[in-house]
């Protein structure tokens, strides 16, 4: 996808992916530089740009030498919206399950009910990404936004129309 089409700005370049970890940046990636509890993504902007980041989403006032700065009052939200546009399309029916107990069971039962009703369905959660043919263990109860959106895109590409997750 062209960077200008993704951002709505008059800029050149091709976006090849999204990354939250500077070690996963490849040429053409959009890097999300966010402050966290343990790490500050802003400390890794230079490394991300050196690895080929084409743009960096961060808070207002943060310098991004060598790449397009995409500042925002809510940088995580802007990053997620841009990534969503990049990874689209997604399955048409998506259900999220929240609560304290029973999420994994509810998600898996929902996937099985959809399958029994004739829908191509998947679930995402503690068990990993489960479809009718396989379960891919992710090791994450809640994947980060890039992993989640990439998984959703992959499921849609495989013809999955219904996804339930927690």
Write out the residue ranges for each language-model feature.
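N-terminal leader/targeting and accessory segments in enzymes
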Residues: 1-85
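Phosphate-binding loop of NTP-binding sites
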Residues: 79-166
């Amino acid at each position: 996808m062209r960077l200008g089409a993704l951002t709505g700005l008059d800029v050149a370049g091709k976006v090849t992916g999204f990354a939250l970890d500077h070690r996963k940046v490849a040429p053409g990636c959009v890097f999300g530089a966010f402050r966290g509890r343990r790490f500050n993504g802003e400390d890794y902007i230079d490394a991300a740009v050196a690895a080929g980041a084409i743009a960096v989403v961060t808070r207002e006032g943060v310098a991004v030498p060598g790449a397009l700065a995409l500042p925002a009052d809510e940088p995580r939200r802007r990053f997620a919206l841009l990534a969503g546009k990049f990874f689209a399309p997604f399955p048409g029916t998506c259900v999220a399950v929240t609560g304290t107990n029973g999420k994994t069971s509810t998600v898996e039962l929902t996937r099985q009910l959809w399958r029994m009703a004739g829908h191509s369905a998947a679930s995402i959660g503690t068990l990993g990404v489960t479809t009718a043919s396989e379960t891919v263990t992710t090791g994450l109860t809640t994947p980060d936004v890039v992993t989640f959106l990439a998984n959703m895109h992959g499921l849609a590409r495989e013809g999955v129309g219904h996804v339930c997750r927690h």
